[in-house]
């Protein structure tokens, strides 16, 4: 009989190919900062230490009886890795206001991999992936439009085409790094859909990163809030619309995004649904107490 971890990893590979049979969805809430409560340390310290990150995330996953854990959440780490200053005294970090970034430069994969938070996340992934009995390992990253907004907020000046190309190359490089480390699921999270004149550049960035993910048999999932998702869903990524998003014909919705606040989570569907994956649209608030989180996870599972 196929072990649960192996079963879910195979299902994620099928999702990347648009294949496979319907099944009860994999529940992957974006949990990161909450895990620091296990050691009673600041989250910003935990996310810079691969071993601590692995231990705390794995322990919290076991406490919550989840079949997946998330080793990275959207938290400005992509911008930080290319030279943007971010706050180091709070979680999640915030973008600084000045940066010298050349968007025409080649992406240095070694530099990205050496950025402290990315290095710790990759280290944690490798440690977890060594055990074939472990569950699905996910990485949730900043979407290209959100990354462009962060770069511009930091003072990076560039035209739309150049800066979206830069964002796409960053995310493609990270997709390769995470996939090679052992991640089974990649998601890109947007706060807003870009303006119409930027749409083609945005789709190009999604395609650049998504193609790399699919090459490694990892599904590239796009999470976009319902209130900001005007226009057809881009074909470059697996659609993961918000819970109240209208249907996406002719696209089949194999993933769904719930709100980050556990108090608003509905009950998990069991069988007979198209969704094979349920994420949260952002990180679960890090101040959420583990006992509260556990009670909410048990509630949505009907326990």
Curated annotation (Swiss-Prot):
Any one GO molecular-function label of the UniProt entry: ligase activity
Lineage, opening ranks: Bacteria, Pseudomonadati, Pseudomonadota, Betaproteobacteria, Rhodocyclales
Gene, per the UniProt record: apc5
Miscellaneous remark of the record: The epsilon subunit dissociates during enzyme purification. However, Apc5 is required for acetophenone carboxylation and the enzyme complex is reconstituted using recombinant Apc5.
InterPro entries cross-referenced by the UniProt entry: ApcE
Complexes and interactors: Acetophenone carboxylase consists of five subunits; a heterooctameric subcomplex of two alpha (Apc1), two beta (Apc2), two gamma (Apc3) and two delta (Apc4) subunits assembles with the epsilon (Apc5) subunit in an unknown stoichiometry.
GO cellular component, one term: cytoplasm
Source species of the chain: Aromatoleum aromaticum (strain DSM 19018 / LMG 30748 / EbN1) (Azoarcus sp. (strain EbN1))
Coarse class of the protein's main subcellular location: cytoplasm
Cofactor binding note from Swiss-Prot or TrEMBL: Divalent metal cations. Magnesium or manganese are required for activity.
The keyword Ligase appears for this protein: yes
Activity regulation field: Inhibited by zinc ions, carbamoylphosphate and beta,gamma-imido-ATP.
Expression induction or repression: By ethylbenzene, toluene and acetophenone.
Primary role: Catalyzes the carboxylation of acetophenone to form 3-oxo-3-phenylpropanoate (benzoylacetate) in the anaerobic catabolism of ethylbenzene. Also carboxylates propiophenone at the same rate and 4-acetyl-pyridine at lower rates.
Swiss-Prot/TrEMBL keywords: ATP-binding, Cytoplasm, Ligase, Nucleotide-binding
Top-rank taxon: Bacteria
Subcellular location: Cytoplasm
Protein name according to UniProt: Acetophenone carboxylase epsilon subunit
């Amino acid at each position: 009989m196929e072990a649960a971890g192996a079963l879910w990893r195979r299902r994620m590979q099928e999702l990347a190919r648009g294949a496979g049979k319907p099944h009860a969805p994999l529940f992957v809430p974006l949990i990161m900062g909450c895990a620091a409560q296990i050691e009673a340390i600041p989250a910003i310290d935990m996310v810079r230490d691969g071993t601590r990150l692995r231990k705390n995330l794995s322990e919290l996953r076991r406490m919550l009886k989840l079949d997946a854990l998330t080793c990275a959440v959207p938290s400005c780490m992509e911008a930080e890795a290319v030279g943007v200053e971010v706050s180091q005294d709070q979680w999640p970090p915030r973008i600084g206001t000045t940066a010298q970034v050349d968007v025409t430069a080649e992406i240095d994969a070694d530099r990205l991999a050496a950025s402290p938070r990315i290095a710790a996340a990759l280290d944690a992934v490798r440690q977890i992936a060594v055990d074939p009995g472990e569950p699905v390992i996910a990485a949730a990253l900043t979407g290209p439009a959100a990354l462009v907004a962060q770069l511009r907020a930091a003072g990076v000046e560039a035209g739309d085409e150049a800066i979206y190309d830069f964002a796409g190359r960053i995310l493609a490089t990270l997709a390769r790094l995470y996939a090679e480390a052992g991640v089974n699921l990649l998601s890109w999270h947007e706060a807003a859909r870009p303006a119409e004149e930027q749409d083609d550049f945005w789709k190009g960035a999604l395609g650049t990163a998504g193609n790399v993910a699919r090459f490694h048999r990892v599904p590239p999932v796009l999470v976009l809030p319902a209130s900001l998702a005007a226009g057809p869903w881009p074909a470059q990524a697996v659609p993961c619309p918000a819970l109240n998003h209208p249907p996406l014909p002719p696209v089949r919705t194999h993933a769904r995004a719930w709100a980050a606040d556990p108090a608003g989570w509905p009950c998990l569907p069991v069988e007979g649904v198209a969704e094979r994956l349920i994420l949260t649209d952002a990180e679960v608030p890090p101040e959420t107490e583990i006992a509260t989180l556990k009670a909410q996870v048990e509630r949505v599972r009907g326990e």
